[in-house]
Curated annotation (Swiss-Prot):
Residues 1-28 form the signal peptide. It comes from the Eukaryota. The lineage of its organism: Eukaryota, Viridiplantae, Streptophyta, Embryophyta, Tracheophyta. The keyword Disulfide bond applies. It is found in: Secreted. Keywords: Antimicrobial, Disulfide bond, Fungicide, Plant defense, Secreted, Signal. This is Defensin-like protein 296.
């Protein structure tokens, strides 16, 4: 009977020690070979455009030239300003780039 209790405690000790050990996890990254950017259209980039860089498909975070121009357009209800400090600091959340300036008397996303 004592041997069964001993085995139970040893087994419980092994289980507790196993649960305390941190097992490192690896983050997986999808690597697709490519020759042109067209080869990367199936890469899941969550709204970011994929590009072929050094023979591998990569998700980019850069804005296109047109997106930057669209972001520069002032809104009809844009606040007037003399200095950038006159603009509402919460405006950065509505700008794609996250930054703004006082341009030609209006608070404008950059």
């Amino acid at each position: 009977m004592a041997s069964k209790i001993t085995i139970f405690f040893v087994l419980a000790l092994v289980v507790v020690c196993t649960m305390m050990v941190c097992i490192p996890t690896a983050t997986a990254e999808l690597v697709l070979p490519c020759k042109t950017t067209y080869d990367c259209v199936n890469l899941p980039c969550l709204g970011r455009p994929p590009l072929c860089i050094n023979g591998q498909c990569k998700c980019t975070t850069t804005l296109t030239h047109q997106a930057k121009l669209d972001n520069l357009r002032t809104m009809n209800d844009a606040k007037t300003c003399k200095y950038t400090s006159d603009c509402d600091p919460r405006m950065r959340y509505s700008c794609v780039s996250g930054s703004y300036i006082c341009l030609n008397g209006f608070c404008t996303c950059t």
